[in-house]
C-alpha cells in the first residue's frame, strides 16, 4: 500500500485480474479469511469510509467527481429497469419471480455498464468488478437479499478504490451519494419484488437486509454524546455477525484485488 490513508494499489504492486472464485467452504476457512489481505483491504475501506462521514448529513454539500456521478447514473439506470419490469400479478408465496428477469437484465448489461464507466486502460479489471457488482443486489434463485449482498456491493466499491478510480477525496460522496442511491435501489427491489431476507436473525438482528447503513449512519451522529461508542460497537457487531458468519461469507469471492492470502501487515 502506498500509505495508510489510501487503498490505491495500482502504483505499489503488480496485479493480474482473474475471475473471482469462492474460497470459504467451512468454518476453518472463515477463521483463515479474517487474516487475509482481502479482509484487511475491505476493513480499511469500510473504516476510511466511516471516517469520511463523521458529523456529515446526507444533505450536506460534498465533492461529486465525474466518476462518482457515473456510478450514480448507472444506479439510476438500474432503478428505471424496475419500472420496465413490473412484478408478476399472479400470487406467489416466496418473492416475485419478475425479480429473476431484473437480475437477468443486470447480468446481460453489467459488462457494458462497466465499459462505459471505466477508462479503457482499466477494462482488464472488469472481470473482477462485475463479479462483486452482480452479487450486490440479491439472489435470483432464492429471490432474496441480505447483508451478504450488501457486502458484495461494498467489495465492488473497495475494488474501485483499489484500482484508483475512487480516490480518498471521493469517500464522503461514496457514502452520502453512491451508497445512499444503492439503498434506494435495493429497498425498492425488496418492496416491488417482495424479496425474502437472506439469513434473517429475527428479533435478535439489527436488520434483515442491511447493516453498514447503520454503521456509517452512526458515524454521522458520532459527535453526539455516546454515539462514538455506538459507532465502534456497530463495527465490532458487523465483524462478529456478518464477516465471521459462515452462512454469509461462504458466498464471498476472491480474486487479485481482494486475494485470499495472508495479510500484508505492513500495508
Model-inferred region functions:
Residues 142, 165-166, 194:
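Short, flexible helix-adjacent loops and helix caps
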Residues 183-209, 222:
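Charged/polar, low-hydrophobicity segments characteristic of intrinsically disordered regions
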Amino acid at each position: 500500500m502506498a500509505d495508510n490513508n489510501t487503498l490505491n494499489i495500482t502504483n505499489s504492486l503488480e496485479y493480474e485480474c482473474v475471475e473471482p472464485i469462492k474460497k470459504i467452504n467451512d468454518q476453518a476457512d472463515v477463521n483463515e479469511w479474517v487474516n487475509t489481505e482481502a479482509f484487511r483491504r475491505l476493513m480499511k475501506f469500510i473504516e476510511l469510509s466511516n471516517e469520511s462521514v463523521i458529523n456529515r448529513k446526507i444533505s450536506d454539500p460534498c465533492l461529486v467527481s465525474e466518476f462518482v456521478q457515473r456510478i450514480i447514473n448507472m444506479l439510476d439506470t438500474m432503478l428505471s429497469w424496475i419500472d420496465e419490469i413490473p412484478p408478476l400479478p399472479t400470487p406467489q408465496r416466496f418473492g416475485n419471480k419478475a425479480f429473476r428477469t431484473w437480475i437477468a437484465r443486470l447480468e446481460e448489461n453489467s459488462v457494458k455498464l462497466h465499459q462505459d464507466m471505466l477508462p479503457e486502460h482499466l477494462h482488464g479489471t472488469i472481470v473482477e468488478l462485475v463479479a462483486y457488482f452482480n452479487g450486490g443486489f440479491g439472489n435470483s434463485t432464492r429471490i432474496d437479499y441480505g447483508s451478504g449482498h450488501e457486502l458484495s456491493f461494498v467489495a465492488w466499491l473497495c475494488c474501485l478504490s483499489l484500482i484508483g478510480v475512487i480516490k480518498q477525496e471521493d469517500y464522503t460522496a461514496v457514502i452520502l451519494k453512491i451508497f445512499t442511491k444503492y439503498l434506494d435501489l435495493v429497498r425498492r427491489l425488496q418492496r416491488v419484488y417482495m424479496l425474502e431476507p437472506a439469513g434473517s436473525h429475527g428479533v435478535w438482528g439489527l436488520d434483515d437486509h442491511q447493516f453498514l447503513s447503520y454503521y456509517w449512519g452512526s458515524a454521522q451522529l458520532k459527535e453526539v454524546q455516546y454515539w462514538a461508542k455506538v459507532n465502534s460497537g456497530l463495527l465490532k457487531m458487523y465483524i462478529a455477525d456478518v464477516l465471521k458468519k459462515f452462512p454469509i461469507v461462504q458466498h464471498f469471492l476472491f480474486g487479485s484485488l481482494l486475494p485470499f492470502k495472508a495479510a500484508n501487515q505492513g500495508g
